[in-house]
Design a protein with these regions (language model features):
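Conserved binding/catalytic microenvironments
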Residues: 1-169
Length: 169
């Protein structure tokens, strides 16, 4: 098995979530109409993975550490003994109106520019199909593995976003 320790921990936490919240998740999913059984199954997996991440990085504690560490993703990675990608994904979830975090967006992109994972709670519009804007620093990060690159992206509507990019192993 070639999975990293962090990936194994997330899978174990998702299994714990399934044991503890399977009934509630099934009940929640029953409120929606899915185009196929497969799409319902994938949605359930996504919810279980979300619960798994919440077990490893509980909301209040994670939010507190984000503020304390000024959203330094590598320090958060070390603090919670998780992967960089898991931390990057988790910061996008800090959207509780009672305890909000900074709005983040998240992309996972391969060497060919294909987007394989996307979350945008920052307001930035990420293409649903194809690749992201070729000027985004996500592509230049591929030329400098393991090094965080920061850039300010100015959109056509005048909105500005700070974008960080880094390769993950």
């Amino acid at each position: 098995d070639y999975s990293s320790l962090e990936t194994k921990k997330l899978h174990a936490a998702a299994q714990i979530a399934q044991e503890g919240a399977d009934k509630e998740i099934e009940e929640y999913l029953s409120k929606f109409t899915f185009p196929s059984d497969e799409s319902k199954k994938l949605t359930k997996i996504a919810l279980l993975n979300y619960c798994g991440a919440a077990i490893l990085m509980p909301y209040k504690l994670f939010h507190t550490e984000c503020k304390k560490l000024k959203y330094d993703l590598e320090l958060l990675q070390n603090t919670f003994a998780t992967s960089f990608e898991q931390v990057a994904h988790r910061v996008t979830c800090l959207q509780d109106p009672k305890l909000p975090g900074i709005p983040f967006h998240f992309l996972r992109v391969d060497m060919a520019g294909n987007i394989s994972k996307r979350f945008s709670l920052s307001g930035i519009e990420i293409p649903r199909y194809g690749g992201a804007c070729p000027r985004w620093n996500v592509y230049s990060a591929l030329t400098r593995p393991g090094i965080i690159q920061a850039a300010v992206s100015k959109m056509s509507n005048g909105e500005k976003y700070v974008c960080i990019a880094r390769t993950v192993e």
